Amino acid sequence: MIALDTNVLVRLVLHDDETQARAAERLLVRARREQTELFVADVVLCELVWVLTRRAGLSREDIAAALDQLLRTELFVVGDAAKIERALAAYRAGKGDFADYLIREQARAAGAREVATFDRSLKGETDFRVL
């Protein structure tokens, strides 16, 4: 297994640096050939969404589609796919950031009854308490 940093996924999605995008694609080809999984940590997904939103200006729909494609590709492995898929569904439907919904999923798994936040965009969202 090989763990990926955020910048590798950014290059694969955006192709904003052709040299690095080609190197990232070669890594995928090698991983497929060698039947090696590519691990994507939760924080990498959060950083990826941030970059795609803030730097690339992609829409929520486009970002959700990119994450969905990543989750459906057998080559990529994530920590807890069910939590990530629930967070992704909430991101598609809600107003918060993907990271907010992933935090909520991890908090629920840890037994927390709510997530305290100052983020006003989460007002009215289930299991968030805006302070």
Where are these regions (language model features)?
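Acidic, PIN/NYN-like endoribonuclease modules and their adjacent C-terminal/linker elements
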Residues: 1, 104-131
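Short, well-structured N-terminal submotif of metal-dependent ribonuclease cores
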Residues: 1-40, 55-62
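Histidine- and aromatic-rich ligand-binding microenvironments
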Residues: 5, 40-41, 96-97, 119-120, ...
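Active-site neighborhoods of divalent-metal-dependent phosphate/nucleic-acid chemistry enzymes
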Residues: 74-114
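Amphipathic alpha-helical segments within well-ordered protein domains
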Residues: 49-53, 88
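A generic structural signal for short hydrophobic patches within well-formed alpha-helices
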Residues: 9, 45, 122-123
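Glycine/small-residue-rich phosphate/adenosyl-binding loop
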Residues: 57-71, 75
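Structured helix-beta-strand junction loops
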Residues: 34-35, 73, 94, 125
